[in-house]
Amino acid sequence: MAKFNTGSNPTEEAATSSRPFKVAGQSSPSGIQSRKNLFDNQGNASPPAGPSSMPKFGTTKPPLAAKPTYEEKPEKEPKPPFLKPTGGSPRFGTQPNSVSRDPEVKVGFLKPVSPKPTSLTKEDSKPVVLRPPGNKLHNLNQESDLKTPGPKPGPAPPVPENELKPGFSKVAGAKSKFMPAAQDTDSKPRFPRHTFGQKPSLSTEDSQEENTSKNVPVQKGSPVQLGAKSKGAPFKPPKEDPEDKDHGAPSSPFPGVVLKPAASRGSPGLSKNFEEKKEDRKTDLAKNIFLNKLNQEEPARFPKAPSKLTAGTPWGQSQEKEGDKNSATPKQKALPPLSVLGPPPPKPNRPPNVDLTRFRKADSANSATKSQTPYSTTSLPPPPPTHPASQPPLPASHPAHPPVPSLPPRNIKPPLDLKHPINDENQDGVMHSDGTGNLEEEQESEGETYEDIDSSKERDKKREKEEKKRLELERKEQKEREKKEQELKKKFKLTGPIQVIHHAKACCDVKGGKNELSFKQGEDIEIIRITDNPEGKWLGRTARGSYGYIKTTAVEIDYDSLKRKKNSLNAVPPRLVEDDQDVYDDVAEQDAPNSHGQSGSGGMFPPPPTDDEIYDGIEEEDDDDGSVPQVDEKTNAWSWGILKMLKGKDDRKKSIREKPKVSESDNNEGSSLPSQHKQLDVGEEVYDDVDASDFPPPPAEMSQGMSVGRAKTEEKDPKKLKKQEKEEKDLRKKFKYDGEIRVLYSTKVASSLTSKKWGARDLQIKPGESLEVIQSTDDTKVLCRNEEGKYGYVLRSYLVDNDGEIYDDIADGCIYDND
């Protein structure tokens, strides 16, 4: 210890002589006197000279960036109560106080280290000072601890010490760094490296001491202790737990060994380097403390830096003050420029493999007990923080995050599962200062999202229920409407879809009756049907949905628009009306392409006075045309002609009538006849299982032309037609006759027939009566039909013999066995 004091005098005086202020009465003692003082200090167990060294460097000139107020304070610097008579003791304890007083000192010019090796050589002969390299600092701390039982002079005058900020010199900074190094090894070449490693630490202390100089006492501790303490992760600020303060007691072992787990938590690569290179450990620690200070979120951690220069101060005293520093306000000044700090220390070797995932997971698991954010708040990638070149501008970003340290600890364990995928995707992206808050907010937002999902499910269920209810109501309403429409269709004999033909306006109030529509003057009425109505009335519908007949004189009608509407919907019926009498001409014309525009008078709507009479005459046709497309108009015409032919009285004409039916089925296979419902009443099974190709043309086809004239005169005999239909039904039921009724040939009853008693299935015949043979039942009887349309069996013996030609024509007729 005394070596540094004796050896550093020339340099110290040289450094202080260039300053405008110098301590009065301070002269460099001789080497013998220094040794004597050293022995006195060790033998008497004098208290640490940390505070007593304040008058040594109290008058040094502040650096270029020092405040001008420092020049006014040198007169307060000497502290006689704490000075030891010897010269070595003040020098030995100068470093901690000078560092704590001078936060503005710039150590960038700390280069006069040449006298230090000579001092080391002198100390080789002192066995009292020399200790094993592994325990030098530890023993030194123990010696300092033995000196501390007395009153601690450091915190006694806190105000004067805070005012003596410019009292730190370059040589003092150098001595504070070299003393622990000299005790570890006697090699000289290591001094420049320690000097460079110390510069950033001193600059950090300069920027940090300003925040704590007002309320925090002088810090005491070895630089190695601070390095070991701060060697923790450069990306993760070290834990500030009361346990750490307890470890800093005077009886604690070497600080580097105690705080080694902190380094392994922050950076596995640095911990490996610490184990492999014990020679360079102090350089690494000096560099890592500066990185740790830059990356810390709480500026209260920075006041620990002055303890690095207090070689003779116990570690426990510096830790006792740590609790007071944590509550300090953030620092207000950035670090000095790089030109003042000097060149950075050499960069240590990088570990071969660096994997921070397990540390991130461990940090996320322990984040509940930490008040700091998990990783670096400066958002630096992993490699750059190890390089000191990027260190000076970084402290400027610290004041931008002052509120973060004041936040209470947050319990962010629930979102651990959410953080792992983020770490997996962003391995090189460190967690930012607001990462914890964002994750918590994300968790809250996700919780809200889940609540929204639950509520949305409930809303969906409600919507589904409402939708079901609405659909059920719609179905009920639809069923009611359909039921009502069916009743209306049945009541008013409506066929096909209901179409609005015309819109009319009521010209007077009408009070309807049973089937009549009631409406008021000016009300709009939709005309649904203008045919198949009672004379002078149309079928209308009001806006309320009521149906009924209206008088044509009670509404205002635009006949021009009605004609155009009628022509667009149905242009064929008027031509049929004109050619009603010429049935076959009409059919032939319909057989043509059926179009030609239907222009001219044939497509014009008839005048109102004759509308009722004309449409009543052809109401069956209009019904069909209103509900059937124009494609079926040809079939309509054919059915109309067939119906007229069915009204003949003559049985021979009836047989001729069957041929057009067959030809119609041949020409229009697959097409449905709209008016067939009127014909099916005659015999629904007429067209069942019938193929026109199975039967040869009837021999009576030649007489078709002869029946045309009579068909016209007999077409208006509905009673005869109904009777014929009834007889055909009896035939099918009584004789189990299937298929089309076809006449095989005609014959007459023998004139020699005598009246006899007929059976239930026998046809009552008269002598000379003409009969139509429908079926050859067997060799004794045949199925015949008389002129009245009745059917029955007739014995062949009662019929006139036609020379056996009859049997040739019927071929396989015997297959019909109706017995």
Curated annotation (Swiss-Prot):
Chain intervals with Polar residues compositional bias: 1-45, 668-677
Record-annotated membrane-spanning stretches: none
UniProt biased composition (Basic and acidic residues): 69-79, 237-248, 273-285, 454-489, 649-664, 711-728
Coiled-coil residues: 448-495
Residues covered by region (Disordered): 1-490, 589-635, 649-728
Tissue specificity field: Expressed in hematopoietic tissues such as myeloid and T-cells, spleen and thymus. Not expressed in B-cells, nor in non-lymphoid tissues. FYB-130 is preferentially expressed in mature T-cells compared to FYB-120, whereas thymocytes showed a greater relative amount of FYB-120. Expressed in podocytes.
Localization per Swiss-Prot or TrEMBL: Cytoplasm; Nucleus; Cell junction
Composition bias type Acidic residues, residue spans: 439-453, 610-626, 682-692
Keywords for the protein's UniProt record, in alphabetical order: Acetylation, Cell junction, Coiled coil, Cytoplasm, Nucleus, Phosphoprotein, Repeat, SH3 domain
Domain SH3: 499-560, 736-804
Ranges spanned by the short sequence motif Nuclear localization signal, renumbered to the chain: 479-493, 710-736
Residue numbers bearing the Phosphotyrosine modification: 559, 687
Gene inactivation effect: Slight defects in platelet function.
Compositionally biased region (Pro residues): 150-160, 342-351, 380-412
Biological process, per Gene Ontology: integrin-mediated signaling pathway; protein localization to plasma membrane
Any one cellular-component term (Gene Ontology): protein-containing complex
Modified how: T-cell receptor ligation leads to increased tyrosine phosphorylation.
PROSITE patterns on file: SH3 (PS50002)
General function of this protein: Acts as an adapter protein of the FYN and LCP2 signaling cascades in T-cells. May play a role in linking T-cell signaling to remodeling of the actin cytoskeleton. Modulates the expression of IL2. Involved in platelet activation. Prevents the degradation of SKAP1 and SKAP2. May be involved in high affinity immunoglobulin epsilon receptor signaling in mast cells.
Stated name of the protein: FYN-binding protein 1
